[in-house]
UniProtKB/Swiss-Prot annotation:
Gene name as annotated: xseA
GO molecular function: exodeoxyribonuclease VII activity; nucleic acid binding
This protein's name: Exodeoxyribonuclease 7 large subunit
Statement: the UniProt record of this protein carries the keyword Cytoplasm: yes
E.C. number: 3.1.11.6
Function: Bidirectionally degrades single-stranded DNA into large acid-insoluble oligonucleotides, which are then degraded further into small acid-soluble oligonucleotides.
Compartment(s): Cytoplasm
Top-level class of the enzyme under EC nomenclature: hydrolase
Record bears the keyword Membrane: no
GO CC annotation terms, alphabetical: cytoplasm; exodeoxyribonuclease VII complex
Amino acid sequence: MDKIYTVSEVTYYIEALIDQDQYLSDIQVVGEIADLKERNGHLFFYLKDEFTTIGCVFFGGAYRSFGLSDGRIAQVAGQIKVYAPRGQYRLICRQAKILPERGTLFLRMKESYERLVAEGIFDKPKRPLPEYPSKIGLITSRNSAAYQDVLRTISDRYPLVEIFLYHTGVQGEDAKGSLLRALKDVNESDVDVVIITRGGGSRDDLWLFNDEDIVRAVYKLRHPVITGVGHQIDTVFIDLVADYSAHTPTAAAQAAVPNLSEIRMHFLELMQRMNLSIRKKIESFSQQIESSNKSLFQSMMSQILRTHSSIDSMKEKAFALMQRQMFSYEKKLSSAGTKLFSLNPVELLKKGYVIVEKDGKWVKSSSILREKDEISMRFFDGVVKVVVK
C-alpha cells in the first residue's frame, strides 16, 4: 500500500469501525474488578480475567447503587468506545451486577494473608524509629519519582543524614528477585533505619508488596522499617509488618528524619526557657542573700548591742569595785598618815621633848656623855649648844 496515514486517521478509522459494530454497541462483560478509582464524579476501573484487561468507566454517579469494589466479580453492561486522545478502547458502562463468586486476585490475597497470619508475621512488636538517624537505607527504583521525593524531603528536613540507595525494580518479571536482593543487602548493612517505597499504581502494580516471600524478608530485617508504598488509599502486606507505615513516599521520608528547622526552634525555645529559669534562680538567690545579709546584720547588731551592754555592765562593776578599793585605800592611808603624824619628831618636840646630839648623832643615854663634852640640844623651835659638867 502506498497511502500513508496519520495517527489520528488510524484512530478515527478504528473508532468508526467499533461504533458501527452492533455487537459492541450493547455488550455484557464479566470479569474481576481491579484498580477502582473515583475521579471528578466518575468511576474508573478495570475488568480482568486470567489473560487480559479492559478499561471501564461509569460517567456520573449512577455507579454508587451497584456496590462495586476491588476483587469482586462483576457483570457489566455497556458499549465499547474508543478514547481517541490515548488511542485506547474501553467499556462505557450503563449497568453492573456483582456476582457471588470472588475474583482470583482476591482469593490469592486472602490465602496469602491467612498463611502469614498463621506464621505470626503480623504479630511482631513495632520497634521505635531512631530519633536522629545518621544512615538511611532506601529501597526503591533509582528512576522513580518516589526516589526523588524521598531525597528532596530528607534534604529539606535533615541534610545531616547519609542516604544509601538499594536499587530495585518495583514491577515486572524481575522485580521480585531484585527486591529480595535489595532486602538481603540492606539487612547486612549498618544503616539505622530502612525505607521501602514506590509511587502509586494499580493493584496489580502493587501486588509485589503482597508477595509472601517479600513480606517474610521484610519481617526478618534487623533494622526498623518504614514503608511508603502507593497512595493514601493503598495498603499492602508489608505495611502490616513495617515498624511504621506511611501513606506516601514523602510521608515515609518525613517519618524517617526530624525537621532540623523545628529542632533549631525547639533548641532556641529551650535556651530561652533555660535563660529565664537561670534569671529567676539568680533573682531568688539574690533575694535569699539579701535576706540573709539583713538577718546576719541584724544578728550582728544584736550581738554588738548585747556585747556593749555587757561591757557597760562590766565597766560599772569595775568602777564600783575600784571606788570601793580606793575608799579602802584612802582609809588605810589616812590611818597610816595619822600614825605617821603622831610619830613625827617635831610633834614630840612641841610636847617638851628635846633631842640631844653629839657629833651629829643622837644621844640615847646619859652614860655615854663625859664631862666637858659639847652637845647640842634640839628644841622644836631651835638648837642650843651646851657643855656637860
